[in-house]
Regions:
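Proteolytic maturation boundary segments
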Residues: 1-105, 252-254, 259-303, 307-316, ...
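Conserved alpha/beta enzyme-core scaffolds, especially Rossmann-like or related mixed alpha/beta domains
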Residues: 244-246
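Phosphate-interacting basic helix/loop segments used at nucleotide- and nucleic-acid interfaces
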Residues: 234
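M16 family metallopeptidases and their MPP-like homologs
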Residues: 1-8, 80-82, 87-176, 186-196, ...
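Conserved short beta-strand edge segments in small beta-sheet-based binding/regulatory domains
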Residues: 180-186, 281-282
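Bilobed periplasmic-binding protein/Venus flytrap-like ligand-binding cleft at the lobe interface
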Residues: 174, 272, 329-339, 387-395
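Short intrinsically disordered coil segments
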Residues: 18-24, 109-112, 327-331, 389
Length: 436
């Protein structure tokens, strides 16, 4: 018999002795353990007697190019349907509305950020997460809320035969979110334990510092900390959730997969149509949490078992949100990735790899950002930093190498062709059209 114990090696953490472990083993072996009996009784997800008033479709729009049908319901919900035959047993659901964490105060912000984890642990309606899993046994259907700085969302997936179950879960997530104090207390305990260990992780400390410096110590863009978790207030959670998901109007509900629109329509009218409308459609608020302007340099040290230097560059600014600019930034990041692979990894052997990532946004402003990061040793750090900037200046002056662009162009074309037969890709394309 082999017993394995894993525990962090740090001051204040007591590891049980061999004698204590064996005593626990002997106690369990001597106890009388009865077989587990699952006495779950299947119940309707939505309680019997619940009146679902529904809302009819009042407007229909066909998009021949995307192959979609758009319904606007009387309660203000917008529903987009894209039938496909890529996967016979898959229907995807995407729900997005503008708003997100921007609707919350600074004090509410991080509780809102943790809301998806709370939902996952607490269940929905009258069912705990464990009870819900049992109720859904034999079915393939799930719905999970998510939230970003400027959007509130939900995602779901089901088999075609279980689409009504998925819609019931969707209705419950909007109208009957569940908050259980024991579940939330367990979540906060888990977070505090993870954060206690993270404080000795130099990679976490680096991420924490980058977020703090990039956004000028803005309280809405910090890494989560023990101080933040200690301020979580269970009583505020229902009100915060209501701000994130106030009603059906302002949200776009997208279905992609093996669906028959005529079969789906009455179910949409029944369940999505029964989600109440908010007094005014959801929309985001510009919370002014922008990256700092100008050049800012920050250096710090942290204890580590294996010494290294981590370098992170963050470039950002305003840029018109156009397809041309998005493509240009994509090609720039790939050109830099190719150049750094040669000049830093292969020629200098200074790092396992340089990570270059770029993104564009149009909410709350039209902006771009690009990060360049790598790990190296102290002796080579300054030299590699010079190479990073030299490659950027070279592209700015003379443009990228044609072979780098052509290689990525071929990759993008191949990826795009493959994406045309993926439900997830079509979900993304449709949500981009509707401003998500």
């Amino acid at each position: 018999q082999v017993i394995v114990i894993n525990a962090p090696e740090k001051e204040g953490v007591a590891t049980p002795t061999a004698e204590e472990i064996l005593a626990i083993r002997d106690k369990v072996a001597a106890s009388e353990v009865t077989a587990y009996e699952d006495n779950v009784v299947k119940e309707p997800l939505i309680a019997e007697g619940t009146v679902l008033k529904g809302s009819p479709v009042k407007k229909t729009v066909e998009d021949k190019q995307l192959g979609t049908t758009e319904w606007t319901l009387a309660n203000g919900a917008k529903v987009v349907v894209k039938p496909t035959t890529f996967k016979a047993d898959e229907v995807r659901l995407g729900v997005v509305g503008k708003g997100g964490l921007s609707l919350l105060s600074d004090e509410e912000y991080y509780m809102g950020e943790m809301m998806p984890a709370v939902n996952s642990m607490s269940g929905v309606g009258k069912f705990s997460a464990t009870e819900l899993k049992k109720q859904l046994s034999g079915k393939t259907a799930s719905v999970q809320p998510s939230v970003e700085n400027y959007t509130s969302a939900m995602g779901g997936v089901c088999s075609p035969k279980d689409i009504e179950t998925m819609l019931q879960l969707l209705y419950l997530n909007f109208t009957q979110p569940r908050f259980n104090k024991d579940d939330v207390d367990n979540l906060t305990k888990m977070l505090l334990a993870q954060l206690a260990n993270a404080k000795s992780n130099p990679d976490f400390l680096m991420q924490e510092k980058v977020a703090d410096v990039t956004y000028g110590h803005n309280p809405r863009r910090q890494m989560i900390s023990t101080e933040i978790v200690d301020k979580f207030d269970f009583e505020q959670l229902p009100g915060i959730y209501a701000k994130l998901y106030p009603g059906a109007n302002g949200f776009v509900f997208t279905f992609v997969g093996n669906i028959d629109p005529e079969t789906l329509k009455p179910l949409v009218e029944k369940y999505i149509g029964s989600i109440p409308a908010a007094r005014k459609p959801i929309n985001y608020v510009d919370d002014k949490a922008y990256p700092v302007k100008g050049e800012v340099t920050e250096e710090f040290t942290a204890p580590m078992q294996q010494p290294k230097v981590s370098v992170n560059y963050h470039f950002s600014g305003e840029m018109p949100y156009t397809l041309k600019n998005k493509m240009a930034l994509t090609f720039l990041t790939q050109a830099l990735n190719s150049r750094y692979l040669v000049s830093i990894r292969e020629e200098k052997g200074g790092t396992y790899g340089v990570r270059v990532q770029g993104s564009t946004k149009y909410i709350p402003r039209e902006t771009y950002s690009m990060t360049i990061s790598f790990d190296t040793n102290e002796e080579m750090a300054d030299e590699l930093r010079e190479i990073v900037m030299k490659e950027i200046e070279e592209i700015a002056a003379n443009g990228p190498k044609s072979e780098d662009i052509e290689k990525h162009r071929e990759f993008m074309l191949k990826s795009w062709k493959n994406s045309l037969e993926q439900n997830g890709a079509w979900m993304n394309y449709i949500q981009i059209k509707y401003g998500s």
